[in-house]
Amino acid sequence: MELLSTIRIFSSPNMKDLLIQLSQGKVIIYPTESVFGLGCDPDNKNAISTLLKIKNRSWKKGLILVAANYTQLLKYIDDSCLNETQRSRVFSTWPGPMTWVFPAQANRSYWLTGQFSSVAVRVSHFEPIQRLCLAFGKPLVSTSANLSGQLPARTIEEVHDQLGYKIPIMHEDILGRPNPSKIRDVMTGKLIRE
């Protein structure tokens, strides 16, 4: 019942259906700041496995989590080793299109971190992502909606061309940023992806 009252607050043409799909361990497609994203429940190993198969992506690469707020990420990251300068650097870019690679919690799931002991996370300012993560109550796995090695999809037509018609899509437009989020290491500030 609580889920249904939450859905009414966050209006989107098919929000209720998307939340049901996520809670059942399914993969969805949703708009991000620059491209369409494939997403699923970060706590559901089968959902992540399905996402990796759809994308034809190796589990070793790890995945990004996108959240509505910092609190949603605390289950997945270990921020205890950050000093004030590092914290300030992160919070000066969030919410926004900056992904930070944090040390992962000790009980991390290898299907999120891949071969690494870290996890990439982002707090988005983009309203559709905010609504989706708040309504779902946790972050989403976030990777571009395309086959590995192909260009990321910027339109629903491009999504259908690469991934077909079986995955439910959040019917809203991308924000239109020209590039995916930058990725930086939280400990060093080093740029990993421009």
From Swiss-Prot:
It is found in: Cytoplasm. Pfam families: Sua5_yciO_yrdC. It catalyses: L-threonine + hydrogencarbonate + ATP = L-threonylcarbamoyladenylate + diphosphate + H2O. Keywords: ATP-binding, Cytoplasm, Nucleotide-binding, Nucleotidyltransferase, Transferase, tRNA processing. It is an enzyme of class 2 (transferase). Required for the formation of a threonylcarbamoyl group on adenosine at position 37 (t(6)A37) in tRNAs that read codons beginning with adenine. Catalyzes the conversion of L-threonine, HCO(3)(-)/CO(2) and ATP to give threonylcarbamoyl-AMP (TC-AMP) as the acyladenylate intermediate, with the release of diphosphate. Belongs to the SUA5 family. TsaC subfamily. This is Threonylcarbamoyl-AMP synthase. GO terms for cellular component: cytoplasm. Coiled coil: none annotated. InterPro entries: DHBP_synth_RibB-like_a/b_dom (IPR017945), Sua5-like_dom (IPR006070), TC-AMP_synthase (IPR023535), TC-AMP_synthase_SUA5 (IPR050156). HAMAP family: TsaC (MF_01852). It comes from Blochmanniella pennsylvanica (strain BPEN).
